[in-house]
Amino acid sequence: MPKRIVYNISSDFQLKSLLGEGAYGVVCSATHKPTGEIVAIKKIEPFDKPLFALRTLREIKILKHFKHENIITIFNIQRPDSFENFNEVYIIQELMQTDLHRVISTQMLSDDHIQYFIYQTLRAVKVLHGSNVIHRDLKPSNLLINSNCDLKVCDFGLARIIDESAADNSEPTGQQSGMTEYVATRWYRAPEVMLTSAKYSRAMDVWSCGCILAELFLRRPIFPGRDYRHQLLLIFGIIGTPHSDNDLRCIESPRAREYIKSLPMYPAAPLEKMFPRVNPKGIDLLQRMLVFDPAKRITAKEALEHPYLQTYHDPNDEPEGEPIPPSFFEFDHYKEALTTKDLKKLIWNEIFS
């Protein structure tokens, strides 16, 4: 028997059906009785674990900031009655009927559909990157789709702000052991993220987009690794094992470089044989996304300009985004010291600001 889901929400809403559930929240559709509009309401119980609260705080801040056609829109966040009884967060957002994971697994997609879905994904990533935001968890289930095939990126709980003035962008020192958060799905994780402790850059999102594009072509994940080693073997089995010092210079850790050298030496696989019925322009874009060296990987802006997406590309309708300062996620710099009550206060302030 399914468990009963309780929503403590305004009487203005009538719950309809369960849309999905994850580790720390559920999403239901609901009717807004005064207007008749059908919305999605995400219920989060963030105070069981500090990591859940941090993810919720990032999600709220990001979604309040962005107003973009390919990023999920929030209409409102229900205001709790009192701080003492504040145990749940209710985010009211636009209703999307499904997600890309479900679409891929249930139907064949035309090349035009594939172009449109990856175009919209990259259009969102371009504005995020122009705003100094890295999503860090792009995957088909985080790309919501409606009946018009409109696509919206969701789930910003692992997002980070890039500090352009910093020598590198990694988790603040000492925070990689205790409150480690990088739990993004391994299958979409860039090789440099797997091989280097906690650094991150815009290029890691582009790798994830490449994995998504390949999955649109194959109708299954391209790198479904069972574990860390298997994941790298699958990646190198397709892009080739990097072996020269020039290939490996993007990996700073000597230990990681030695580990790569210990792996089997695979040549790059010819993608046109792997994808015999795929538009050659699509294969060319994929090859530019799945590049080992993040500095040589195509950017989201460049990908939008690629011939594969020329049907949809419009330079006047692909916003760049305004840079967000690192202070936007200031709490990430001292998150180890934050108590649950501290995080509760930060989320409370964000809801009421």
Swiss-Prot record:
Q: Which reaction does it catalyse?
A: L-seryl-[protein] + ATP = O-phospho-L-seryl-[protein] + ADP + H(+); L-threonyl-[protein] + ATP = O-phospho-L-threonyl-[protein] + ADP + H(+)
List Phosphotyrosine occurrences by residue: 182
Sequence positions bearing Phosphothreonine? 180
Which EC number(s) are documented for this chain? 2.7.11.24
Q: Per the record, a Pfam family?
A: Pkinase
Where does the Protein kinase domain lie? Answer: 13-309
PROSITE patterns named among the record's database cross-references: MAPK, PROTEIN_KINASE_ATP, PROTEIN_KINASE_DOM, PROTEIN_KINASE_ST
Q: Tell me a GO biological process for this protein.
A: positive regulation of protein export from nucleus
Assigned keywords, A-Z: ATP-binding, Cell cycle, Cell division, Conjugation, Cytoplasm, Isopeptide bond, Kinase, Mitosis, Nucleotide-binding, Nucleus, Periplasm, Phosphoprotein, Serine/threonine-protein kinase, Transferase, Ubl conjugation
* The record's account of how the chain is modified after translation: Dually phosphorylated on Thr-180 and Tyr-182 by STE7 in response to pheromone induction, which activates the enzyme. Activated FUS3 initiates a feedback signal, down-regulating phosphorylation of both, FUS3 and KSS1.
Activity regulation info:
Activated by tyrosine and threonine phosphorylation after pheromone treatment.
| Disulphide bridges | none
Cofactor names from the entry are: Mg(2+)
**Is the keyword Cytoplasm assigned to this protein?**
yes
Q: What is this protein called?
A: Mitogen-activated protein kinase FUS3
- Naturally occurring in which organism (per UniProt): Saccharomyces cerevisiae (strain ATCC 204508 / S288c) (Baker's yeast)
